[in-house]
Amino acid sequence: METFLFTSESVNEGHPDKLCDQISDAVLDACLQQDPDSKVACETCTKTNMVMVFGEITTKANVDYEKIVRDTCREIGFVSDDVGLDADNCKVLVNIEQQSPDIAQGVHGHLTKRPEEIGAGDQGHMFGYATDETPELMPLSHVLATKLGARLTEVRKNGTCPWLRPDGKTQVTVEYHNDGGARVPIRVHTVLISTQHDETVTNDEIAADLKEHVIKPVIPEKYLDEKTIFHLNPSGRFVIGGPHGDAGLTGRKIIIDTYGGWGAHGGGAFSGKDPTKVDRSGAYIVRQAAKSIVANGLARRCIVQVSYAIGVPEPLSVFVDTYGTGKIPDREILKIVKENFDFRPGMISINLDLKRGGNGRFLKTAAYGHFGRDDPDFTWEVVKPLKWEKTQA
């Protein structure tokens, strides 16, 4: 049997880039909670002892940006300079302006347009992907890397591994078999974890704890064998981390946010953007489309692309490819997608309830992936029953 290796990585919530994603989405949540029509484009950057939020926000909401920054950093675990950032004593800089009136009139006619008339907030193309290799209909390499990162945070916060610090990265290589275009995982080839730690712990203790408390509970036994390679803190030392170790910036982990290198990516980031930004809403609706195609048995694996022009409601193009796994021709599936999904930005917002912020709704998306999550707030993960003539099959 011919096999191949494919690798996906993840970072956990204490990684500086992910810290920035979470702050940007916490700001979005705060704006949408008070004013669902908020227009938000919020970027964050961080380096030693400093966090800056900047961008364009037009909202009726009364938002305390500094408090959101400090609360988000504290919740992640950045509570002292030792761990990489002190939430209560770091410098917080804010440079927020209103959305450009040129963009505003082109996209939503200064709020005079009906939902179906609202134009895309920018040009761009987005991809949605789904595969039947996991219950989440997500790639296994990505699912495992993401879950390892989430588990690292869990055992840090619940005290199981008190030597852990917030920053950390994971990477998983899976050996796959190509089954007529579908992807069948055979085994896990390599597991890599690099996690920030305190000064007291030894490398042997780190390796033992990571195997017992992180890898064992996450990776199903059937995928591990005596040949599986483990790289556990291979650099030997990772005490300095968070923004002290590396600068961070919103939108730098777009593959981790999506499909771990599978499918394709149009390049647009998600965090800190309200649903008129098709980088986000467009990517969410094509994930729902791709997932629904696979879940309804139309294909085992699928990618959907949509593209937009600024100020224009209707998409410029929609594309479907089932990698040869479709039960009916791709052109028929494309027809079904167009009949069952409304790709106009204003309608995506309504159908996926994307104007509802607050309660950490979008903050939750900003760590451990936007897709494949079992959470009612992730409305784009709901499978749509597709209307199609079974006689076509």
UniProtKB/Swiss-Prot annotation:
Q: Name one Pfam family in it.
A: S-AdoMet_synt_M
Q: What is this protein called?
A: S-adenosylmethionine synthase 2
State where ATP binds: H15, D167, G168, K169, S235, G236, R237, F238, D246, R252, K253, A269, K273, K277
Concerning CDD domains, the annotation shows: S-AdoMet_synt
Coiled coil regions in record: none
Cofactor note (record)? Binds 2 divalent ions per subunit. The metal ions interact primarily with the substrate. Can utilize magnesium, manganese or cobalt (in vitro). Binds 1 potassium ion per subunit. The potassium ion interacts primarily with the substrate.
Q: Which UniProt keywords apply?
A: ATP-binding, Cobalt, Cytoplasm, Magnesium, Metal-binding, Nucleotide-binding, One-carbon metabolism, Potassium, Transferase
Q: A GO molecular-function term, please?
A: metal ion binding
Q: Which cofactor does it need?
A: Mn(2+); Mg(2+); Co(2+); K(+)
- Which species does this protein come from? Vitis vinifera
Major location, coarse class?
cytoplasm
The family note in this entry says:
Belongs to the AdoMet synthase family.
Which PROSITE patterns does the record match to this protein? ADOMET_SYNTHASE_1, ADOMET_SYNTHASE_2
Reactions listed under catalytic activity: L-methionine + ATP + H2O = S-adenosyl-L-methionine + phosphate + diphosphate
The organism sits in which domain of life?
Answer: Eukaryota
* A GO cellular-component term linked to this record: cytosol
Tell me the organism's taxonomic lineage: Eukaryota, Viridiplantae, Streptophyta, Embryophyta, Tracheophyta
Q: How does it assemble?
A: Homotetramer.
Output the InterPro entries linked to this UniProt entry: ADOMET_SYNTHASE_CS, S-AdoMet_synt_C, S-AdoMet_synt_central, S-AdoMet_synt_N, S-AdoMet_synthetase, S-AdoMet_synthetase_sfam
Q: Which residues bind Mg(2+)?
A: E9
Binding of L-methionine: at which residues?
E56, Q99, D246, K277
Cite the binding residues for K(+): E43
The entry's function note states: Catalyzes the formation of S-adenosylmethionine from methionine and ATP. The reaction comprises two steps that are both catalyzed by the same enzyme: formation of S-adenosylmethionine (AdoMet) and triphosphate, and subsequent hydrolysis of the triphosphate.
Pathway recorded for this protein = Amino-acid biosynthesis; S-adenosyl-L-methionine biosynthesis; S-adenosyl-L-methionine from L-methionine: step 1/1
